[in-house]
Amino acid sequence: MSTQTKPSIVFVHGIWADGSSFSKLIPTLQAEGHDVIAAQYGLDTLAGDVAAVKSTLARVSSPAILVGHSYGGTLITAAGTDPRVAGLIYIAALAPDADETSQSQLAKFPVTEVFSHIEVADGRIWMKPDGVACFAGDLTQEEQKLVWATHAAPAADLFNQKVEGTAWRSKPSWYIVANKDRTVQPELERFVAKRMAATTFATDSSHVPMLSQPDFVLDVIRKASNAVRKNMAA
């Protein structure tokens, strides 16, 4: 067991985003004594993205908490079975079971508004500029423009791919429901949070509470960190 006093934090982004989507959280957590890193990956294949998350785990001390946003929830569900992972935090995220894909989980609930504002080109799924209001509508106009300018488009078949691993069945989990989400159905978020028996928090945010309500998200991370620290000391 590591002698560190606080778990490391590994951020795992969703589609139409990258590691900078956690920029309002990272400096505070670093100042509070955590090793922090944001995984980066190509959104080309699910297996490749999971492998990238596991490789990123090796760059910080163990144990670690994985924090997954949106599609990042699918990644931490698979990568979180790694013994270096002590807990999982889901932010408005998917959390497929062993017999589900990201797409099959989304399909269990009504289609959200953002999917009327996408286009497929060159084998990738791009968000149109007018889709940002459905993705991050509670940010300033300047921030929304930055979100679009930096959004990473996934491979068109990414959400239909599967890998093994259902970490929320064996690791302590926390979940942040975004009540005003127009990208992932809030009903889906509440369903998966209940199914995994997660410690659940809810806030009236868009799909990106880590950008629109960073203090709320930081408080949840602190609560999860304190719980993991108690387990580390046991």
What do these predicted regions represent?
Residues 81-129, 155-162, 192:
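Flexible "cap/lid" loop of the alpha/beta hydrolase fold
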Residues 123-168:
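Conserved alpha/beta-hydrolase catalytic His-Asp/Glu region
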Residues 175-177:
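Short beta-strand/loop motif that positions the catalytic acidic residue
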Residues 48-64:
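Conserved acidic catalytic loop of the alpha/beta-hydrolase fold
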Residues 67-72, 76:
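Gly/Ala-rich beta-loop-alpha elbow adjacent to hydrolase catalytic centers
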Residues 179-204, 211, 216, 223-224:
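Conserved loop-alpha-helix segment in the C-terminal half of the alpha/beta-hydrolase fold
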Residues 4-46, 64, 78:
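Conserved HGGG/HGGXW glycine-rich cap/lid loop of the alpha/beta-hydrolase fold
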Residues 42-43, 204-208:
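Histidine-bearing beta->alpha loop at or near hydrolase active sites
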